[in-house]
Amino acid sequence: MKGYNVIGYTIMFAYALACMYFAPLHIGPWMGLLIGAAYFVICWFIGGLYLSSVIHMGIAHRALDYKEWFVQTITVVNNTFGVYVNPVTWVNRHRLHHKFSDHPGDPNKLSSDGFWRTLYLCLMPYKCAANMATDDIFESWSFRLVSNPVYAVVSQVFNFGLLWLLVGDLTFASVIWLTFRVFALWINMIQNYWTHDRRFGYRRYDDERDNAMNIGEWLPVTATFSACLQNNHHHSPGLLRLSHEECEYDFGFATVRAMKALGLVRATSSGAKLPKDVPLASLNF
């Protein structure tokens, strides 16, 4: 088993044990595990839809066209009740990341940055040298609200306080809240470190301009909503799906297809254009 999988499963196992061990007497260990699991799954799923499917593929790459009410709703819900991610600064960093790809100007990571440096950069990224997030939606009330630094602090204090109120125990709430954010940091490291180091994963396209790799195991693909298929994505960043063969497991694309069935999203003209060198007969979308 690869090291990144060991770390991911270890965090999840430690989270489960901590939920049972620190559960207060009036809840008990098994109910504590159930509460912790519910918090984990809900925050992960909403966060994945928000960041990977909507902000990443919908706004940053304009490959998918979501209903605007859905974009604004999930943005407010995730950033109020889940792990906060500023949509404006994230889109700006991500576009710069694709423009410079592991070279000076990439705010996420340079090719020379190791594990610990990249871990630090997940929390304190390099300064952005340009503003590439000028989309009209960033001027909407919801995006201006959640992008406010005061909101970033207040929302996290609020959702921690709400969790504390619901479970009735400060220690138990702290364990759930903090440990899940460690898991979220691991997800970020999958995307920023392990998929940008040629010692890990596999490369379908030998693009020398960056170090992007595909990591295709079940846990990373599920946890990141397929954002760990970075070599595919960097080769065709405007394509609406991240898997480039039917045999590649693509959890993120499955959720997008489900949202399409619900009438929440459609392909953009650029997102639906299948490059000739991508080994897919069709997008199946």
Which positions does each model-derived feature cover?
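Non-catalytic, topology-defining segments of multipass membrane proteins
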Residues: M1-I190, W194-T195, L239-F285
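Glycine/small-residue-rich hydrophobic helix-like segments
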Residues: N192-E246
